Amino acid sequence: MLDVRKLLTRRPLLFDGGMGTYYKTKPGQECEQANLTDPEGILAVHRAYLAAGADAIKTNTFSLPRLAAAQQPGWEQLADAGWQLAAKAAGETGAAVFADLGPAPDTENNPAEQVYLAVAKRFALLGARNFLFETLSAEDGVLEAIRALKQTVPEAFVLVSFAVLPDGYTREGRYCAELVRRMAQSGVVDAVGLNCVSAPGAMRALVQQLGDAGLPLSVMPNAGYPVVARAQVRYQGKPEYFARELSRLASEGVRILGGCCGTTPQHIAALRTALDALPETLPAAPAAKSAEAAKPVVEMDDAFLRKLRAGQRVIAVELDSPKDADLTAYLEGARRLQAAGADLLTIADCPIARARMDSSLVACRVHRELGMNVLPHMTCRDRNLNATKALLLGLYAEGVREVLAITGDPIPTAERDEVKNVYQFNSRKLAQYIVSLAGEGREMPSPITVFGALNLNARNFEVELRRAAEKLENGMSGFLTQPVLSAQAVENLKKARETLGEQAKILAGILPVVSQRNAIFMENEVNGIHVDEAIIQKFEGLDRAAGEELGLEVSVQAAKAAAPYADGFYLMTPFNRVALMERLIARLRTEVTD
């Protein structure tokens, strides 16, 4: 069998092309099932790619990590058959065989690391020494699995390949250059690259962003972009164009080339011919595209961040956006809060999954008209990656430099036939994506500061703290907490300060309770809020005015209890009672923050 490491010292390595899009599966059947139901058909595909000139072929096992994660019976037999068919075909020409592993889902009960390792070890027992982890959107668990694999098979050659959109980001919002850098610095990955999603021309542009990764670079684009014709998905990229673009990459230093979706033996044959026509001496690695002179970053003066970083206690006030299309009263309320001394206005993103005026659009209007710092909430519930990026670019252009990234309340079950959740990622991955948009040559010259939520009322606060630490690792700068309405919430706030450190900016949540009915409702129907029973009883029999007075006093005392462990306060306006918030801000300014 071909020695991949030796070949790469002499010339580029040519892989095969797509399996699933070339081999026509039966309706409802996984392509991998054909390893058992149609072995001759799969063997014929392998042989066609080898006849086209491929130096290496992939086992027909892309979906195995997903099947293994689901504990689907028989995945081991699919692995065995997939390996045996590829090895049989490669044995006829001396080509290399790569055990092919697609993305594994990462869950608490079945971490991706364990899934990858189980599948890779199965292949290793069959004799595999070359492994391809492909079409990944993130590195979750893959490096840990490779480290463990190499303890068992130290001679293993491992190629890790990411699926990257033409804008340089994966579907999980990870920036390609950062992913490649992490693989190159791991010490356990032998080659790294890009595959799928993008067509040859776009992938060539992506490679120019990467420069010299320090490892052999792999490129396996799709034939083109998919179109639907007669209820079938087709790729229209021509073999000649595919070969021309990839041979250019080879002449620029890419060492491993092949095809993904829509590519056929004709594409690989054309690329084989083009590669054979190249001079024997080629660059060892691609050169980075020379960047244009960077424009000087003129960063706006952010009074909220400046005050927060200087150690002064800040006050953020949440005011829910209107349920209708009239913003007049809202803007007047925002003006009053600003005049009262609020440092920041926060705007929820359709709380409890009920549609309101868009939080980001409202934030832009407030910032533009009042010059006030704003913090729009951004959930993962309603937008995919494209919509999220488009919104972030618009926010940046409008001068908004802070967002609150949250996963978001799910759509009520009864409405899910008409309104769908999106949840392409969670708040941690959203934060990581937002931070990754800033930097030299990227979409934003300076970063957007990302805050997250911290639930002081979580039943298992240790788990909540672990998640908070992960949020910080993924780029968040601080947290807005759920309301402090119990002694346990204060104790958890203290624990958060001790655990997360002074670098994590924490704004303690203060929500005035205004009636016993209001308190009982929040205790029983609002996720993340716990109202102490003693507080609920205090409101019994009070009218509106008396209830508001008591709510004000309870809020001030809660703020005083939270103050030693907080960098400021996050005030939530009940029922749009701006006058109450004006009084609360005044009390906090005189009794707590100053």
Where are these regions (language model features)?
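Domain-level signal for soluble alpha/beta catalytic cores
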Residues: 1-594
